[in-house]
């Protein structure tokens, strides 16, 4: 079931959306027109998942150049939803825009609730009778800013949607299932007698230490949830155009001016029977370019989108040089250890340029780009878009695959045989065991004789060897080390 929240600008639609979803998904600001695209959230209640759609403020008299597209997006949400919430400002009384929206929504013959928001005081509640003229029988007064009567609104939604309440037995079973899933979500990767050097023996203390290391490793929990893919990039590189082209519909508002997208827009899509959630983000700007609080919140949410994504798509403009902002975004992706793919958009404007030469030059500009997969696409001409799904699936599959201990040790043993570590103070680095420790984020744990014998160049050599062996391009990973305990002298 889906609920659409509609209304004129600045009546508190996004505040109600955030209260219902119990998360700050939409930017809330006193500035009119803060929300532009359709935003999707979820209510988890009554043993059900109810999808909620926040829409931009509809004002047909506005001179805002985005208003025509906002109006189109709002009506699309109304058609898509099964329950409608028309939000008004109780302190302003009925406005012309409220009347126009009510006339548009009533003929849809869908359950419609009039939400009289901003009822912060008893004096505000005395104006309820003014809204009978809209012809909507289901009415409720709320104060989203003070979290008043949101629970009553939620119950009214359940009633008009005819969602049955779960029985006491079903609630108890749900709690037991949640507890069971938490217990089973932790699995240990075990191994026995898999040594890098077969003739190397371990003392009892070393064996106990190794068991402790194994207990620290994690394996990915199996999940059927959609894959979250964040499109990141500086303003006006075509992130929203890519989402629209992939979905083959005008799902996100696009414009030639930078900063059109403000909220993070989550868009669900199914491709080849696999579910994805594309997160269209506001472009990251330089700090000096952020002029108001809405832009600051947009940039902050972009970083949050990176943190909650399963995989990031960095979108750059083929017609422009790699910018400071592009490099900053790459560093953020690396900091959050997110698998990523580089999308070079607007390739239709690159006349007389060979793609392979462009990619070679691009790889030389930044060490992180040099290690990632690069796709040259055109959202405008829908060129090479299907490759995005293939690249995302390939990278994510590799990034979530647990590598066997024996295979990791075999690769490192070969690396050490091909290139011996240098001798330091008469001693040489030895690796006794190596474990693929975690998947998200990706990391390896090496059991070595001494940290002081590991040089930076040799560490880089080991990382490059693992990257090439397991195709970890575009997958940031760490090497962690534990020196074996010193043997006790008799």
From Swiss-Prot:
* Any one Gene Ontology BP term: ribosome biogenesis
UniProt-annotated binding residues for GTP 1: 7-14, 54-58, 117-120
Which parts of the sequence belong to the EngA-type G domain? Answer: 1-165, 227-400
CDD domains assigned: EngA1, EngA2
Pfam families for this protein: KH_dom-like, MMR_HSR1
Record field: compositional bias (Acidic residues): 169-178
GO terms for MF: GTP binding; ribosome binding
UniProt cross-references to InterPro entries, sorted A to Z = G_ENGA, GTP-bd, GTPase_Der, KH_dom-like, KH_dom-like_a/b, P-loop_NTPase, Small_GTP-bd
The residue ranges of the KH-like domain are: 401-485
Q: Where is this region: Disordered?
A: 165-184
Keyword GTP-binding assigned to the entry: answer is: yes
Give the Gene3D superfamilies listed for this entry: 3.30.300.20, P-loop containing nucleotide triphosphate hydrolases
Residues binding GTP 2, per UniProt: 233-240, 280-284, 345-348
- Which keywords, in A-to-Z order, does the entry hold? GTP-binding, Nucleotide-binding, Repeat, Ribosome biogenesis
Q: State the family named in the UniProt similarity comment for this chain.
A: Belongs to the TRAFAC class TrmE-Era-EngA-EngB-Septin-like GTPase superfamily. EngA (Der) GTPase family.
Query: Subunit structure of this entry?
Result: Associates with the 50S ribosomal subunit.
Give the protein's function: GTPase that plays an essential role in the late steps of ribosome biogenesis.
> This protein is called what?
GTPase Der
